[in-house]
Design a protein with these regions (language model features):
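N-terminal single-pass transmembrane signal-anchor helix
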Residues: 1-26
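Juxtamembrane interface helices immediately C-terminal to a transmembrane segment
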Residues: 17, 26-37
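Short, well-structured segments within or immediately adjacent to enzyme catalytic domains
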Residues: 32-279
């Protein structure tokens, strides 16, 4: 009997030692799969750019909204195209019957966007072309850097920045390896600015308002990192605080108030972010 208790105690001790390591390995596997998804999206985006003289999608209005409507319908369809989902975030905030979850978290997908759930338009006509949403709608857990959308030259992005701040010619982008394209996010597009703060709550789903754009992308799905593709078509891990060092738009201040160079202090960060690397 004593020997059995000793064996049980040893097994319990080994499990206590091994479980954190196994959890870390599982998380690493999820991020590898996440990065693989973004590589697949690189092919989609690069093919579109090559077919459109270096221009990215325009979106379906002058602000660049609704760009996924311009994808091929099979690329739109989350039931066909599984690369819409980070492995850590697959459950949509709206189900197919149009019922919203009671509690929303960063591990939720942002869908399902379609007429019967969120009231998303079934089709949109812009600049003489009509774009149609697939019957299953949109659903995913990645989002696009809105400053790479080809809005009109005289237009402005969400938040008020003029179109000249964006990247209109994808063949001539300075420091393309620092310009994010597609990454873990709480919406399918966003327009971060250097002075925007992260969310106060680690697991908080994003709120409405242009001031929350950086909070839509600074989300802890990968142990202090996120996954991002870039305009040189590389894909890599990005530290959460490193997001403020990326060149989101042409004049984005990479030494802004949320960087070490800009004077940020540990106490300025929400408590959940303080343990992660500074940049």
């Amino acid at each position: 009997m004593i020997e059995l208790l000793v064996v049980i105690a040893i097994i319990a001790l080994l499990m206590a030692i091994l479980m954190p390591a196994l959890s870390k390995v599982k998380d690493q596997a999820r991020q590898i799969a996440c990065i693989a998804n973004l590589r697949q999206w690189n092919f989609v985006f690069n093919n579109y750019i090559n077919d459109n003289d270096g221009k990215f999608y325009s979106g379906c209005n002058d602000l660049g909204y609704y760009w996924p409507w311009q994808l091929d319908r099979a690329e739109q369809d989350w039931k066909i195209n599984k690369t819409w989902f980070c492995p850590t975030a697959k459950t949509p905030v709206w189900n197919e019957q149009g019922v919203q979850k009671e509690s929303l978290y960063i591990t939720d997908a942002w869908g399902i966007e379609k007429p019967s759930t969120t009231g998303a338009p079934a089709s949109m006509t812009y600049q003489g072309r009509t774009y149609t949403l697939n019957r299953n709608g949109l659903n995913g857990s990645y989002g696009l850097n809105g400053y790479i959308l080809s809005i009109p030259k005289t237009g402005s992005f969400e938040g008020g920045l003029p179109s000249t701040e964006g990247y209109r010619d994808m063949y001539n982008v300075p420091n393309a390896s620092e310009v994010p394209v597609f990454l873990d996010a709480l919406r399918f597009d966003f327009w971060p600015q250097a002075d925007q703060a992260p969310a106060m709550n680690e697991y908080e789903f994003w709120q409405n308002g242009a001031q929350y754009n950086m909070a839509r992308v600074c989300i802890n799905r990968h142990r202090g990192f996120t996954s991002s593709s870039f305009l040189d078509w590389s894909v890599r891990r990005v530290g959460l605080k490193e997001l403020w060092k990326l060149k989101w738009h042409r004049n984005f201040d990479v030494n802004g108030p949320w960087t070490k160079a800009g004077g940020v202090q540990p106490s300025n960060w929400p408590e959940w972010l303080r343990r992660f690397k500074d940049y």
